């Protein structure tokens, strides 16, 4: 439950980074930090507790006139996994020369082996984190090309990561990379941003690029260069966020959960709008894209998800059996991915996720693909990893859900699952006698 925001452009970076961190507070965290870069090099600030504590440190330690000189920076909210919630363990973390710094979401699984090797070579670690093993490893590989150093370091890393990297010797760029932890690049006029969640970008741009696993990008004020792990240039689509700033603000409510409870009627309307053919009593879900041949071969539906999405699937299970006349079951994605699930081309797997980035659900999709199974996605976020991985499915159009406790996303998921059950049922020529009306 960490957050990343980065900025490079011509505007003062500090307020943009702090504003981004505040948009990411909903993810939960125990400390925060940022790194700013100018001609004099890197400057970092860290604080335990709320982002407000970090703001206090900035006000106390950074002269007001200095704010204008920093037009490049990266920032992070941390939820402790390796090491206690202390300032030393807060991000960003440096390499040995203290010219390279990194913010990181995810877990470096082989960090102990990397740490021990580097210690044997004379490195003295400042923190207890897995991230510092990565930042120092990047420094070891740095010989004037930050992107190449990141590529080489990541080739030695096992685990999940979403990272943003700064180097004092290359102040005109931020290097970013993703594997198993979401990152999205935002593009403005003469500026670029990167964040772990699009909600941190909505105040600055509507034009975004969602990175895929294995992508390594270099962003400058005027360009985005994305390559794969073999250093080959690749193209990623530019998407429109389609969000306004009001969607990620409380709007007069005491907290986001209360706001989102009251948004449920509208979110259900959005989920159903334009998707019901009242004349024929059918659902219009072109995104499912299931041919009559594929529909005829479905013998079982397997709904996979985690948390709230898993519970939405439990409701959907009854609907598919009752309305579609197809055997259905619900499985925890975190367990499905580690088993040898008995699924094949006669099964339909429906992967449910609000964010479209749930790591266990993504892994479950890939496991199902290995078995030759048909897969549909049911997600809220357009352009998310699950939407791209499945290639077909349905969006719930609930808008951003900031509260950790899901409300409108759950009701939207249930509404769309009922539509999907209706669509499959009508496709199998079930009628009134079978309980559809």
Set out the residue ranges of the language-model regions.
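Glycine-rich phosphate-binding loops that contact phosphosugars or nucleotide phosphates
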Residues: 296-436
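Acidic-histidine catalytic/liganding microenvironments
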Residues: 264-265, 323
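Hydrophobic face of alpha-helices
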Residues: 131, 135, 147-150, 258, ...
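Conserved short alpha-helical segments that host acidic/polar catalytic motifs at enzyme active sites
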Residues: 1-255, 263, 269-302, 338
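Internal active-site segments that recognize and position negatively charged phosphoryl groups
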Residues: 255, 259, 309
């Amino acid at each position: 439950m960490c957050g990343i925001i980065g900025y490079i452009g011509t505007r003062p970076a500090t307020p943009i980074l702090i504003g981004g961190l505040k948009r990411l507070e909903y993810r939960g965290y125990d400390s925060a930090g940022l790194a700013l870069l100018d001609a004099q090099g890197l400057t970092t600030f860290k604080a335990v507790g709320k982002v407000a504590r970090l703001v206090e440190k900035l006000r106390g330690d950074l002269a007001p006139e200095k704010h204008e000189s920093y037009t490049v920076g990266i920032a992070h909210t941390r939820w402790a996994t390796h090491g206690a919630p202390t300032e030393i363990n807060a991000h960003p973390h440096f390499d040995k020369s203290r010219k390279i710094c990194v913010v990181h979401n995810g877990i470096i699984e082989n960090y102990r082996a990397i740490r021990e090797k580097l210690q044997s070579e004379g490195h003295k670690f400042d923190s207890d984190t897995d991230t510092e093993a990565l930042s120092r490893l990047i420094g070891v590989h740095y010989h004037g090309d930050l992107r190449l150093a990141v590529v080489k370091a990541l080739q030695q890393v096992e685990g999940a990561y979403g990272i943003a990297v700064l180097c004092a010797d290359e102040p005109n760029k931020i290097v970013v990379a993703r594997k198993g932890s979401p990152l999205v690049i935002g593009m403005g006029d003469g500026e670029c941003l990167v964040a772990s969640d699009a909600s941190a970008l909505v105040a600055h741009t509507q034009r975004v690029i969602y990175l895929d696993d294995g992508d390594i990008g270099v962003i400058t004020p005027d360009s985005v260069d994305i390559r794969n792990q073999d250093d080959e240039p690749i193209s990623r689509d530019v998407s429109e966020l389609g969000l306004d700033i009001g969607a990620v603000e409380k709007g007069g409510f005491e907290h986001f959960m209360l706001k989102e409870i009251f948004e449920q009627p509208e979110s259900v309307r959005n989920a159903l709008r334009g998707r019901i053919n009242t004349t024929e009593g059918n659902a219009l879900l072109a995104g499912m894209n299931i041919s009559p041949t594929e529909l005829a071969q479905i013998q079982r539906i397997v709904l996979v998800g985690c948390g709230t999405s898993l519970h939405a699937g439990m409701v959907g299970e009854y609907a598919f059996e009752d309305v579609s006349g197809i055997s259905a079951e619900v499985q925890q994605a975190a367990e499905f991915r580690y088993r040898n699930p008995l699924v094949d081309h006669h099964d339909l797997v429906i992967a449910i996720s609000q964010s479209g980035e749930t790591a266990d659900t993504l892994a479950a999709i890939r496991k199902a693909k290995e078995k030759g199974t048909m897969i549909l996605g049911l997600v809220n976020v357009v352009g998310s990893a699950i939407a791209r991985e499945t290639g077909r499915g349905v969006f719930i159009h609930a808008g951003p859900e900031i509260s950790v406790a899901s409300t409108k996303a759950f009701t939207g998921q249930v509404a769309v699952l009922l539509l999907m059950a209706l669509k499959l049922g009508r496709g199998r020529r079930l009628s009134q006698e079978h309980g559809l009306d």
